[in-house]
Amino acid sequence: MGPGDPELVTVKGVNALREADVVVVPVMDTMERGRAEATVLHYVPEEKVVRVVFALNERSDRGRREAAWDAAGGRVAELLRAHDAVAFATIGDPNVYSTFTYLAQTIDALVPGTVIETVPGITAMQDLAARSGAVLTEGTEPLTLVPVTAGATVLKEALAGPGTVVAYKFGRQAHEVAEALRETGRIEDAVWGSALGLTEESIRPAADLDGAPLPYLSTLIAPARRDGGRGGKL
């Protein structure tokens, strides 16, 4: 579904939504409309959409998380037995820190023989780079993508290197991220963004981070250390 802007859903993605009998959208609560659903409704009627509760933010209790996943997988399996084609909408790309990968494994076990296809999507880091003007990579520069939920140490190790570092899901650890950027001398060129393409969009220099919590899905780009001139690393 892309990062949230309905105009960034690919043509192939739109076709998949329209060709499906039902479209499953992941939510934390059946009464809450998530970002994936809000995007989907630009392309299919509401009666075609089915909300399924996933443990999207459950990190404290593995047993409860696995039970929630089993329940969600069971619900999607029911839909697959009742319909020829079921689409699952996920923001970003289905193979990048996505709910979809876990669901696909569950469905493969519950409904053997199900043909599972994925449609690539535009990621938040691509959208933030385009909107902020931050260049993700040049020449031989490496690119490291880190979920801040993995811990501040992992982020600091990435920032200590020469390449571009992208941090996902850093909103709740904004203070720790700002400290890591300052300690590694990477804060001046870094930029963060949230709700990209939506009315509440925010794109700011990382130097403005003041320790206040940000939206969970906030994304940060710390560009590579670039000393040479144009084309110097080709």
Language-model features: where?
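Class I S-adenosyl-L-methionine
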Residues: 1-6, 11-115, 178, 200-204, ...
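Short, acidic/turn-prone active-site loops that include or flank metal/cofactor-
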Residues: 4, 28-31, 54-56, 122, ...
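Residue-level detector of structured alpha->beta connecting loops
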Residues: 21, 84, 133, 162-163
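Conserved beta-strand scaffold positions in the cores of enzyme catalytic domains, especially
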Residues: 49-51, 116, 145, 190-192
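Short, surface-exposed amphipathic charged segments that create phosphate/polyanion-binding patches used
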Residues: 62-71, 131-134, 158-161, 203-209
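A polyampholytic, Gly/Pro-enriched intrinsically disordered region
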Residues: 68-78, 134-147, 209-219
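A contiguous loop/helix-start segment that scaffolds small-molecule binding in enzyme catalytic cores
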Residues: 81, 158-234
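Class I SAM-dependent methyltransferase SAM-binding "motif I" and its flanking Rossmann-like core
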Residues: 92, 96-161, 211, 225-228
